[in-house]
């Protein structure tokens, strides 16, 4: 009997130990862990969305300061790049040697419209006639050049005013920078053309002196041919 009791007690002990080793499933803990995991996933998604928005905002700011808005040529008039001809010195020399025949374009048109009497028509000597014609054409040519310079400068100033109005219409920093660059470019072109115009005026004054000197020489030549006494200054020169 004692052996039976001991055997039964041993069996109970083994059974209790076996039950103690089985895992216990806690449904509440699993649900809480899942909820925590989902909450973390939502936070991660929100952080990713915030980072995406920050990136887009930085990209917009970068694009606002960089890139090309295509405003470098807005309101630009290509005819104003050089309203004074590059060969104006050649034009002067052509008039000096060709007279009326060298007058072309606007100069010839203005000469025909403004001339009421030709003071050179009655001159029979060819050199004297061409010299006379050159003196007639020269101021007309100067007026055409000066008028072109004035009109072009006025148009450039109108362009600058329009560009300033465009600046007031936009809030794009890069567009404003491009428009300001255009304004600076137009101002530089006005200064460059002003320098060219000053050189042109100096050349015109020198050309007037050459025409006067040429006329004096032709008069002296004609006087010598006629046997008239020449001025002492000319006698010393020859």
From Swiss-Prot:
The gene is virB5. InterPro entries: T4SS_VirB5, T4SS_VirB5-domain. This is Type IV secretion system protein virB5. Pfam families: T4SS. SUPFAM superfamilies: Typo IV secretion system protein TraC (SSF101082). Residues 219-238 are annotated as: Disordered. Belongs to the virb5 family. The virB operon is essential for intracellular survival and is not involved in the invasion process. Constitutes a major determinant of virulence in mice. Keywords: Signal, Virulence. It comes from the Bacteria. The keyword Nucleotidyltransferase does not apply. Residues 1-20 form the signal peptide. Transcription is turned on at the beginning of the stationary phase of vegetative growth.
